[in-house]
C-alpha cells in the first residue's frame, strides 16, 4: 500500500514523534478536568486532544442545548457496551422544506468505524462544527446550505474501540468489514460471525434505511492513507455511476485539493463488507471513504487539528454545497402529442446519468393511464425522444410526470416528478387520442337528451 504524505509545517515522522511527546504530557492531565475544559477552552484542548466518548458527549449535548433551532441530537443505537451512538441532525428546522417548497437534500456522514483512526472522527466533528458555528456567526454559505439541506452526522461509531485506541470494537470485530454487502468474500481479518453481527453496524445500517434513505451523499471517515475512495472495494471495475465520481474527482483536483480519488479496490486493496459499498450497492447513495491521514493510534496532535484537516474540510464543504447535483435531475422542456407519438425534449441538470426514465400520464385522481417505454439520458446532457403513444387516451384533468432513478446503480431511489402543464402541446389527429369534447358536441348531446325526454313524456 502506497502512503501519500503531504508537505506541511511538520513532516509525517516529525509530526508523529511530536504527537507522542504531546500525548505523554497530556496523559498527566486528569480525565475529568480535560473533559470539562473541552468546551471551555477549545483553543487549548479541542485543537490538540482527540475526542473521547465523554468529551464528544459533552460537546454534542452542548450544541443541541445552545442551538436548538438548527441542532437536533438523536441516538441511532448503542455500542456493544451500551454507549449511545449520537447523531447530529443539522438544518434550519424553522422550515421543513426548501424556500421553493421542495424537499431538502440529505447528506449522511459517519466517523470512527475504527477506534484508532482519530483524525477521521475529528473530520466528522469539524464538519459539524463548521456548520453549527457558521450559523451562529451568520456565515452566508452556511445559512444557504442549512436552508436547503439536512446534515446527519454520526461522529463516533466505535466509541468502545475509540476509548481503548484499537481498530476493533469490543468484540474484536472490524466494523468496516461487517456490512451486508459481499460480506467476508475478500481476504480480510475479523469480519465478525455474520453480516451485522455487531450492534454498531446494525444501528448504522438501520439509520441509513429509516432516516436517510433518500440521501444524495454518504461520506465515511477514516485514516490510514491520504486518499478518497469510491466504490467498489470488491471489484477493480468502475461503478455504474462512474461519470459522477469522475466529475467530482476532476472538479476537486482542479479547484480544491490534489488528494487522490480512486476506485477503492485499485486505490487501496480488495475490501468487502464495507459501509461505503453497502451505502452504494444496497442504498444507492453516492459514497466516499475519506481517508484523511496516514496517522493511527495517537491520542493528540501538536499541529492544530483544524489546520491539519483544513484542506479536507474544504473538500467536505464542496461535496455538501453541491449535493443537489449528485443525482440525475430531469426537466421536461417540451411534450408534443400527435400521430400516435409523444415527442419529448428532456434535459438532465445533474451530474449523474439515469438509464430508465419514462413519461407517465395520469387522470385527475392520480391513476396511471399510460406509461412510455424507458429511455436514458447522460449526466448534464439532453435528449429528444419519440415514444409510441398509440394506446394513449387523453382525459379532462389529466396530468404528466416523469419517472426515473436518481442514478444508474440498481439500488438507487426512484422519483416521480410533475411536468409543467405549460410545456405540453397537443397537435391532435393521432390515433387513440381523444381530446375533451368541444362545445358543439356538448350542445348536441344536451339537445338529443331533451328530445328523448320529450318523446318519453308524450308516449
Give residue ranges: language-model regions.
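Extracytoplasmic low-complexity repetitive segments enriched in small/polar residues
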Residues: 48-51, 79-82, 96, 109, ...
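Surface-exposed patches in mature extracellular/periplasmic domains of secreted proteins
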Residues: 71-77, 137-145, 217-218, 261-265
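C-terminal accessory segments enriched in acidic
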Residues: 39-49, 183-432
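Alpha-helical scaffolding within the catalytic cores
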Residues: 94, 137-141, 270-277
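Active-site/substrate-binding loop(s) of hydrolase catalytic cores
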Residues: 100-113, 118-242, 250, 289-291
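Short beta-strand-to-loop junctions in surface cap/lid or active-site-entrance loops
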Residues: 87-100, 112
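Secretory targeting signatures
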Residues: 1-38, 344, 427-459
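Short glycine- and acidic-rich boundary segments immediately preceding or forming the N-terminal edge
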Residues: 37-86
